[in-house]
Curated annotation (Swiss-Prot):
GO CC annotations on file: Golgi membrane; plasma membrane; recycling endosome membrane; synaptic vesicle; synaptic vesicle membrane; trans-Golgi network membrane
Subunit architecture: Interacts (via C-terminal part) with SYT1 and SYT2; interaction with synaptotagmins making a link with the SNARE molecules. Interacts with SLC9A7.
Gene Ontology BP annotations: exocytosis; negative regulation of endocytosis; positive regulation of calcium ion-dependent exocytosis; positive regulation of cytokine production; protein transport; response to endoplasmic reticulum stress
Lineage start: Eukaryota, Metazoa, Chordata, Craniata, Vertebrata
The protein's name: Secretory carrier-associated membrane protein 5
Any single Pfam family the record assigns to this protein: SCAMP
TM region(s), chain numbering: 40-60, 68-88, 103-125, 149-169
UniProt keyword Membrane, yes or no: yes
GO molecular function, a single term: protein-containing complex binding
InterPro entries from the UniProt entry: SCAMP (IPR007273)
Main location: membrane
C-alpha cells in the first residue's frame, strides 16, 4: 500500500511549511457517510470565511469611530479559531466516520457544542468582543450608517453559521444514536486504547467500506419489461 502523504492544508510552494494532515473523502469515508462529512467540511469553510469577513467588518467599525480593540480581537479570532476548529471538531468527526470510532464521536460532540455556543455569542455580538453581531451592529447604526451596513454582512453570516451548526449537531447526534453508539462504547475504546490503535482503526475502516460496497452490490430481482401470461388449455 502506498504511503499517504499529507495534503491539507494545500499550501503554496513559496511557504516554507508542509501540510499537516491527509484528507481524501472518497478514499477514507464510507459512501453512506460521505455527504454528511462533506457538509461538515463546508460548514468549517463557511465559519472560516465568516471570521475573515468579520475582520473586514471590524475594520469598517474602526474607521467609523469604533475602538481598535474589536479589530485586534477579530484578527486574533481569525488566526486562532480557523485552525483550532479544524483540529478540534472537524478532524474528530472525519476520523469518526472513517473508523466508526465512538471516542471520536464523543470528542466531536464535546468540542462542537462549544463551537455552537461560540457561534451564538458571535451572532449576538457583544461590543468589545471583536465580533460584528446584532447588538454591536444595530447600536452602531446611530453612529455611522455606512460602517454599520458593512458590519451587517458578518452579522448575518454568524447567524447562518449558528443555525447550520445546530442542524449539523442534530444530524450527527441522530445518526450516532441510531447506529447504536453510546458513551459506554467511547469509554471502552478509551480503556482498551482502540481509539489510537492504527490496526484497529484500519480494520474498522475496511469493515465499514466492505459493508457499504456489499449493500451497493447486492443483487436485485430483475423483472422483464414484457408481461408473460400463461393460459390453461383446460375448459
Amino acid at each position: 500500500m502506498a504511503e499517504k502523504v499529507n495534503n491539507f492544508p494545500p499550501l503554496p510552494k513559496f511557504i516554507p511549511l508542509k501540510p499537516c494532515f491527509y484528507q481524501d473523502f472518497e478514499a477514507d469515508i464510507p459512501p453512506q457517510h460521505l455527504s454528511l462529512t462533506k457538509r461538515l467540511y463546508y460548514l468549517w469553510m463557511l465559519n472560516s470565511v465568516t471570521l475573515a469577513v468579520n475582520l473586514v467588518g471590524c475594520l469598517a467599525w474602526l474607521i467609523g469611530g469604533g475602538g481598535a480593540t474589536n479589530f485586534g480581537l477579530a484578527f486574533l479570532w481569525l488566526i486562532l479559531f480557523t485552525p483550532c476548529s479544524y483540529v478540534c471538531w472537524f478532524r474528530p468527526i472525519y476520523k469518526a466516520f472513517k473508523t466508526d470510532s465512538s471516542f471520536s464521536f464523543m470528542a466531536f460532540f464535546f468540542t462542537f457544542m462549544a463551537q455552537l455556543v461560540i457561534s451564538i455569542i458571535q451572532a449576538v455580538g457583544i461590543p468589545g468582543w471583536g465580533v460584528c453581531g446584532w447588538i454591536a451592529t444595530i447600536s452602531f447604526f446611530g453612529t455611522n450608517i455606512g460602517s454599520a451596513v458593512v458590519m451587517l454582512i458578518p452579522t448575518v453570516m454568524f447567524t447562518v453559521v449558528a443555525v447550520f451548526s445546530f442542524i449539523a449537531l442534530s444530524m450527527v447526534h441522530k445518526f450516532y444514536r441510531g447506529s447504536g453508539g453510546s458513551f459506554s462504547k467511547a469509554q471502552e475504546e478509551w480503556t482498551t486504547g482502540a481509539w489510537k490503535n492504527p490496526h484497529v482503526q484500519q480494520a474498522a475502516q475496511n469493515a465499514a467500506m466492505g459493508a457499504a460496497q456489499g449493500a451497493m452490490n447486492q443483487p436485485q430481482t430483475q423483472y422483464s419489461a414484457t408481461p408473460n401470461y400463461t393460459y390453461s388449455n383446460e375448459m
